């Protein structure tokens, strides 16, 4: 009986705290008594106004909208490195068709790279960003180990319906994209999403890179090079 009372008191305290700090709607959302209203920028790319990164590769350009509101520290890191020329000449060292393309390590081995913060920095998971096809996401070696490496999701097909994905807890709009366009939902809340491809030409370049011949450790046999990255707009 005591355990049940303690649990009830803890829940009541939690509700009271949320009411005092954030209001009744937030408290009800946290208790899942009402559906939380989310801004899902990947579902309305034509309406977004954040900074744009264009990765110029020897296979064409990858144009990406960045999301500083949801991942401020990650976007700031990427923009600063790009403007400093850190990524110039760096290869996509790991390419797996129907999965993703990964780069951002100046050593080209997957073992290097660093952030502007002098050390690895923390994950920035958002309920508003997901690893759908075309998502720009941070590569890592475990929780809170972000540096300079990133990947772009290329998968085009998942063996699940929208209903099955939504049942797993994903927002309806995101579940629909996963079901119809693909992605890597198993990476959500494991890798920080901070951008999204913007146009069809970029998706064609992504698919072309993903189809290159690879050797040991999924490394392309012929280098796929980031020649430079241009940044438009401010975070």
Identify the function of each model-found stretch.
Residues 36-235:
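Cyclophilin-like peptidyl-prolyl cis-trans isomerases
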């Amino acid at each position: 009986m005591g355990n049940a009372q303690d649990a009830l008191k803890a829940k009541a305290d939690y509700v009271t705290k949320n009411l005092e700090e954030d209001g009744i709607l937030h408290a009800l959302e946290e208790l899942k008594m009402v559906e939380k209203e989310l801004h899902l920028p990947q579902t309305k790319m034509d309406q977004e106004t954040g900074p744009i990164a264009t990765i110029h590769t020897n296979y064409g350009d990858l144009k990406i909208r960045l999301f500083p509101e949801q991942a401020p520290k990650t976007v700031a890191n990427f923009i600063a490195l790009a403007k400093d020329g850190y990524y110039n000449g760096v290869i996509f060292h790991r390419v797996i068709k129907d999965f993703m393309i990964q780069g951002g390590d100046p050593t080209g081995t997957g073992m290097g790279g660093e952030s502007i913060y002098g050390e690895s920095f923390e994950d920035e998971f958002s309920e508003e960003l997901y690893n759908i096809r075309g998502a720009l996401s941070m590569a890592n070696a475990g929780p809170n180990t972000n540096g300079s490496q990133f990947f772009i999701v290329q998968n085009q097909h998942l063996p699940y319906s929208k209903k099955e994905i939504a049942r797993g807890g994903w927002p309806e709009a995101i579940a629909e994209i996963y079901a119809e366009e693909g992605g890597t939902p198993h990476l959500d809340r494991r890798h920080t999403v901070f951008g999204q491809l913007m146009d069809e030409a970029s998706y064609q370049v992504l698919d072309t890179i993903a189809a290159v011949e690879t050797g040991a450790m999924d490394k392309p046999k012929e280098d796929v090079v980031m020649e430079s990255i241009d940044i438009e707009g401010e975070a």
